[in-house]
Amino acid sequence: MSVETLHKVILHPFIQESLASLKAMTGLDGYAGDPFIDQVEDFRFKGYAVCSDMTGQLDGVVLMHHYEETAVAVGQAVQQALVGECNINGELDEDLIAALAEWGNTIVGRATHMLQKHNLGFEFASPHVALDLQDMGPYLLGVKEIVTVPVHIEDAGRYYFNLLVRDANQDAELAPVDNISDAYLIPPPTEGTPVPKDALIMSVDDSSLIRRAMHRLLTEMGYTNIITADDGDSAIETMKTHKPDFVFMDVVMKRLNGDDALAQMRELDAATPIVMLSSVTDSNTIERCKTLGAHGFVFKPLNADSGKQVLASYLVV
């Protein structure tokens, strides 16, 4: 595959999604530069990266790669957009890493979903964060070529998309994919009654940042009775004891994923509306959630501008 093909078919959707998510989550604008080939021996780790292994027509890694100062600036902007405040100490601490992970997961999840939907012969692993060269080591093994595209952000610096190529099917004929992935994977109801403002709503996410963001959005919408759970297993216990009227739940979590929690919840309660929120998923997970009776399935991000409108569209029974 040529550099042009690798860029247009594989990296371009990630770049599109990164710019769209950057704008949606932070209000910042950016633009992509021209692709070029990096020498493997000259590759330098810049301070923060989100990595996703890929197999199939190409064996390699998609890497979204930041200088630390850019990572801090973007992380602060994501925090500000989600919860209305940000860490100002200028260091890449746990809270900023969580904000960056949310943005990175959104980009990788939406781009890989879109590529897989077009059956191009690629499979992608869930993204992982690399904070130093030791974390990066496994991803660099066997890499023969690196395609790099710089992305410039207004007043924040730049980051890079790298495609680390271990092996590629040189005979593969691939057409570029230009559209951005669907926002709604299970659409909202077309009719019904809005959920009362005093209803008990449970928000489930293993990210404290997202729990805070959901609480902020729901509170601004007038909902006053909100409880949270930090993973799928605690959500099940909370459902048993508190019996919420409505649930918003993340899919990918540390101890028990949301689709597995949904299955167990449906054994307890077949009627409570449960809307799944995720940026990292696949068609099998979506179909499973449909079968289990999910009230909706939404692709993140949810930001201050559009988040309330999206949530309101599902808060109907």
Where are these regions (language model features)?
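Acidic catalytic/metal-coordinating carboxylates
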Residues: 231-234, 252, 256-260
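Short amphipathic alpha-helix used as the core "switch/output" element in two-component signaling
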Residues: 237, 259-270
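Alpha4 helix (beta4-alpha4-beta5 surface) of REC/receiver domains from two-component response regulators
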Residues: 260, 281-296, 306-309
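Active-site beta3 strand of CheY-like receiver
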Residues: 242-248
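Conserved acidic segment of CheY-like receiver
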Residues: 198-210, 214-218, 247
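Composition-driven recognition of glycine/serine/threonine/acidic- and proline-rich low-complexity segments
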Residues: 2-182
